[in-house]
């Protein structure tokens, strides 16, 4: 993990199928964080770029809908690992989904700033991101 990384927070209850895994928050890694030098296993969050969803919001934002089904239609599984890595463009689309959920809240501006910051750090063209998101 590096300072241009987002930690996406997901959950599901043990009684629910993996397909019900939902997103309940996201935060940028702190500007001075270097994963290779991390000794205590704690990922420090950026002071500003942190977004948390209410339970009602989170239950509408399912994690696995952001990924294409596998070629053999096997059930997607989180497995026993703590981290999943995926393209920054996928993360940018997830941030756009969070922004849409937060349209009528006091977190709307923060969500927009979060997207701008993430896209700038990762050299993602926001215009293309918006166009691709409108197709969905």
Predicted regions and their residues:
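Short consensus segments that form the blades of beta-propeller domains
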Residues: 16-20
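Contiguous surface segments at macromolecular interaction interfaces
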Residues: 36-136
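Short beta-strand-centered aromatic/proline hotspots
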Residues: 21-33
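Short coil-to-beta transition motif at edge beta-strands of beta-rich domains
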Residues: 1-14
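Generic structural hydrophobic/aromatic packing signal, biased to beta-strands
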Residues: 7-9, 29, 45
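Functionally constrained cores in energy, signaling, and assembly domains
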Residues: 7, 32, 54
């Amino acid at each position: 993990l590096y300072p241009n990384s987002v930690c996406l927070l997901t959950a599901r209850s043990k009684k629910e199928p993996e397909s019900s895994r939902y997103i309940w928050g996201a935060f940028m890694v702190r500007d001075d964080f270097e994963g290779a030098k991390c000794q205590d296993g704690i990922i420090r969050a950026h002071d500003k770029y942190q977004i948390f969803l209410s339970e009602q919001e989170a239950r509408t934002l399912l994690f696995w809908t952001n990924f294409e089904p596998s070629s053999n239609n096997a059930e997607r599984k989180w497995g026993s690992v703590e981290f999943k890595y995926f393209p920054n463009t996928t993360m940018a689309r997830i941030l756009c989904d969070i922004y849409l959920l937060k349209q009528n809240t006091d977190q709307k501006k923060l969500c927009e700033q979060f997207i701008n910051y993430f896209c700038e750090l990762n050299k993602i063209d926001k215009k293309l991101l918006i166009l691709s998101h409108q197709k969905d």
